Amino acid sequence: MYESGLKVPLIIYFPPKWRHLAKVSSGKEYGLINFTDLAPTVLSLAGVRPPKHMQGNAIYGKFVNKGKREMQFALASNQLHHFMPVRAVTDGRFKYIRSYIPYRQFALRNYYQWGMPSNQVWDELILKGGGNPEWGQPFQSHPAEMLFDLEKDPDELHDLSGVSEYEGVLCKMRQALSAHIRVTTDLGFFLPDSRIGHILYEKVRQERYPLAELYALVEMVGTATIDLLPVLEEAITSSLPEMRFWGVVGYAKLAKEKRIRTCPQALLALIYDTNPYIASEAAYAISYLGRYQKGITRLLTPTLEKNRKIGYSSLECLSLDPEMREYIRPFIPELKEAAETLPHVENEDAGFMARGILVNLGEMDIKELYGAEAYEKGLKLNHTRRAMLPLPN
């Protein structure tokens, strides 16, 4: 959710035949533009008024929108098997990033990106204790809220969310994002498997799902204090899986921060929840409450094989925490067996995740992460690619 991945130049070229449609001379524009603006712009250039239900603003043509966008929003939900919703908003000067599961590190791997040598070298450097604090930020838990001054800090390294001078800006950005989530009926806080068998957009409307309560809970758990415990106790006993999951997230945050030390029976029972996301998150939480063996065993042994990668995601999260590695080490033989016997060729294979956890524990060199078969397949794929056609003329 950083500018290095979001801020992409938009280059618009009008061939001579159509240059009259631009109605502006060549130059640069520094306004806030996003993908939703493309369709209205094409219609506007064709002389068609964009329908009212269409998102985005026409930036050229007969129906150009002359008003400037004040806020730009961004979202992310999944990093392959890592469910970790993040939202962001910027006004061009300040950037606000909201992480709803802040203990999930941004460096949790996806295995197409980690095929790049630069990512592997970065991992190796940080896991061996090298680099500076800024380089190590993605490998650590992070604040639920982060605020950056893009003019003074374009690389987004210095979080201002705790600086009293910027409290007004922080509040403004927080409110803007909170309102946007509700106006757009953001469904990104539902568990990935909740989309199976139906259209979630229709389901929440037909069943009158309590979205207001869900949004309120989601926003509270990332900044949870012990004062929220009564809310969390109620949430983890809800009949709605989303409420149970986000209640567990609140417990996990408090447990990791050592604000609670006793494991509630209701939380312990959730490691056997029928929903694998809830079970894995509960196993993660109890691992920070002294139930290391029970929690880690649950993450390594899914009820169904198809859910293995969900548990491995939480285990990878644990393995990036130096304090937790000693509790994972007794399970190294099982991880090594999984690394060898489970598939580790395709991007989403569980064997890659087992190997990645071993790398985090210092039990495998990161150069061994992929193995010869995956490496050869990657070479073959990239050697057969051709240049993009057609080119502009």
Residue positions per predicted region:
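Long, internal low-complexity/basic segments
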Residues: 130-144, 152, 160-393
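Substrate-binding rim/cap in mid-to-C-terminal beta-strand-loop elements of soluble/periplasmic
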Residues: 1-69, 158
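C-terminal, low-complexity/hydrophilic appendages and adjacent surface loops
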Residues: 2-3, 80-162, 168
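A structural signal for well-ordered alpha-helical scaffolds and beta->alpha junctions
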Residues: 4, 35-39, 52, 56, ...
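Short, conserved micro-motifs composed of acidic
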Residues: 65, 77-80
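A generic secondary-structure signal for well-formed alpha-helical elements
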Residues: 15, 42-50, 63-67, 98, ...
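WW-domain-binding short linear motifs
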Residues: 70-75
